[in-house]
Amino acid sequence: MAHKKGQGSTQNNRDSIGRRLGVKKFGGEFVRAGNIIIRQRGTATHAGNNVGLGKDHTIFALVDGFVKFERLDKNRKKVSVYPAA
């Protein structure tokens, strides 16, 4: 004879909330210094010119300018900010 009732579905239906990752400012968009461009886990996209990399791998603008996504090499991409001329 069982000493506990079957657990059934009581241990199901839990999930963590989404982390709101992804690109926040797209190519060609104007950004101000400090604006977040990408939130990511790990460096899927690398930091290029005039952008900083936070300790959680967030890429943010260091200067006012326009966002540009570029290739770093065959397998990697980077994002840069170029000041308005």
Curated annotation (Swiss-Prot):
GO terms for cellular component: cytosolic large ribosomal subunit. It comes from Campylobacter concisus (strain 13826). GO terms for biological process: translation. The gene is rpmA. Keywords: Ribonucleoprotein, Ribosomal protein. Transmembrane segments: none annotated. The lineage of its organism: Bacteria, Pseudomonadati, Campylobacterota, Epsilonproteobacteria, Campylobacterales. Belongs to the bacterial ribosomal protein bL27 family. GO terms for molecular function: structural constituent of ribosome. Gene3D superfamilies: 2.40.50.100. This is Large ribosomal subunit protein bL27. InterPro entries: Ribosomal_bL27 (IPR001684), Ribosomal_bL27_CS (IPR018261).
